[in-house]
């Protein structure tokens, strides 16, 4: 199942262009985006991909390369949950304002430099946001997958404390393209090529502008922007 309302919306990431972050107060000047608490890993493959990517990074793209090398990039909670390590109150991969290569995710910068999709280097949750796939077991034993937007509640109790969240902010819905178009690589990775092709075809038809045909009559102007056709005549 798909949340076609969100996927056909014009949402766009506002990092560095108005994003207020996910702290308890507005903090756009910190340019932390949604990276203040690190990224929780989904599985072993997620950890392996990110640690391999980190091993290729150097200080030209990664502000905290020395810290990452010496102390590692992972943290493990008491319950075994693995996440990216925090350095100076944000993700170890987050370059801060004033860094020569620019603020933002060092893994994202590396993906741009290498000419590869960011999903090949970043943690799953990071490249998927603000899209979320949730799999649930149906009573008949099948698995029902739902692809929707990531909401506050998906962050757990801490989500309620966010001063701002981008999928609730009207200013984040002014993008040039619909989400299913701007995040096509991510959706393909989450659903598979065949399913994405069906989704894209459905949404293409859903949002494609329609030509309104208005028949003109003597003494009456055709509506602006409509395509006029001659009035029907008998045969």
Task: Locate predicted features.
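Short loop/turn segments that flank or connect secondary-structure elements
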Residues: 1-235
């Amino acid at each position: 199942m798909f949340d076609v309302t969100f996927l056909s919306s014009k949402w766009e990431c506002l990092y560095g262009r108005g994003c207020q972050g996910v702290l308890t107060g507005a903090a756009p000047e910190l340019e932390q985006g949604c990276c203040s608490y690190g990224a929780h890993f989904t599985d072993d493959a997620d950890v392996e991909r990110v640690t391999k990517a980190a091993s290729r990074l150097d200080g030209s793209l990664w502000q905290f390369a020395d810290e990452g090398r010496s102390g590692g990039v992972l943290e493990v909670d008491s319950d075994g949950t693995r996440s990216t390590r925090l350095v100076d109150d944000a993700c170890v991969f987050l370059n801060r304002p004033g860094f020569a290569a620019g603020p933002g995710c060092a893994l994202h910068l590396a993906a741009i430099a290498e000419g590869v999709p960011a999903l090949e280097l970043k943690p799953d949750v990071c490249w998927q946001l603000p899209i979320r796939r949730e799999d649930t077991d149906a009573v008949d034993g099948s698995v029902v997958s739902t692809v929707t937007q990531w909401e506050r509640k998906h962050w757990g109790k801490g989500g309620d404390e966010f001063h701002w969240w981008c999928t609730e902010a009207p200013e984040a819905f002014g993008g040039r393209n619909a989400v299913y178009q701007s995040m096509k690589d991510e959706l393909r990775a989450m659903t598979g090529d065949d399913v994405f092709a069906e989704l894209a075809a459905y949404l293409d038809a859903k949002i494609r502008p329609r030509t309104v045909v208005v028949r003109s009559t003597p003494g009456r102007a055709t509506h602006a922007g409509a395509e006029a056709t001659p009035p029907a005549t008998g045969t």
